[in-house]
Amino acid sequence: MAASFSSTAPTTPVLRFRANYSKPLLSLPDSCLRIISSAISPSTRLIACSFKTDKLPLGAGVNLSGGPVVKRSLQKRLVIRSATIEEIEAEKSAIETDVKSKMEKTIETLRTSFNSIRTGRSNAAMLDKIEVEYYGSPVSLKSIAQISTPDGSSLLLQPYDKSSLKAIEKAIVNSDLGVTPNNDGDVIRLSLPPLTSDRRKELSKVVAKQSEEGKVALRNIRRDALKSYDKLEKEKKLSEDNVKDLSSDLQKLIDVYMKKIEELYKQKEKELMKV
């Protein structure tokens, strides 16, 4: 096999093979030599051998017919852009913000639930969770009526629309307040009888159950945040040490909110047991 270099493109040498070749001037990979040897029609076969020497660039075209090179093989290159420090910090910040927001919402939900549980004294917050069917849609009682506490054992409800009196009365009866509303056609009065010892114990169990549900919600928030940190580690955006530090900070934050739940629980328990 005889070979010659084209002089028309000095910067891109072209290796041409004559049909009657004996030995190439440059050493070719075995895979290329096998293709050349098995070629049935050298006039139609074009080979792009991916090899590099001092004289032949990577991916140079090889024409078996000895004619000009028709095509130059182009290599596809995959470029992976690494995340910047700013992008990584933004992702971490988003996770932390989401965690705090969810924890605050958990505390607020628990506080609302506790306020709706009746204690020894009348409290407008006892009606926070009551919804009234108003013109075909459920709305909060406090949004359609003014609620006041004339004394420590009664509540007074004055609706903005008197046509809603019946609906308000029905909603109170169907609630778990355990009181009978007095509808005089203008306002609704609620007289709160003293809590019995058994009723106080029942409500104490309800408070304990809701408190535990709040703690479970916090643990679930922590679990989801840890999964997000693990994902960033797998994406090589965080190191193992970074994740350990973030997990430690997350646990400290969880402990703070767990303490808040415990404080709310103890305060409500104290109110329930106060005669």
Swiss-Prot record:
This is Ribosome-recycling factor, chloroplastic. Residues 1-82 form a transit peptide. Gene3D superfamilies: 3.30.1360.40, Ribosome-recycling factor (1.10.132.20). GO terms for molecular function: copper ion binding. It comes from Arabidopsis thaliana. InterPro entries: Ribosome_recyc_fac (IPR002661), Ribosome_recyc_fac_dom (IPR023584), RRF_sf (IPR036191). Keywords: Chloroplast, Coiled coil, Plastid, Protein biosynthesis, Transit peptide. Belongs to the RRF family. Residues 215-271 form a coiled coil. The lineage of its organism: Eukaryota, Viridiplantae, Streptophyta, Embryophyta, Tracheophyta. CDD domains: RRF. One of its GO terms (biological process) is plastid translation. GO terms for cellular component: chloroplast; chloroplast stroma; cytosol; thylakoid. Responsible for the release of ribosomes from messenger RNA at the termination of chloroplastic protein biosynthesis. It comes from the Eukaryota. It is found in: Plastid, Chloroplast.
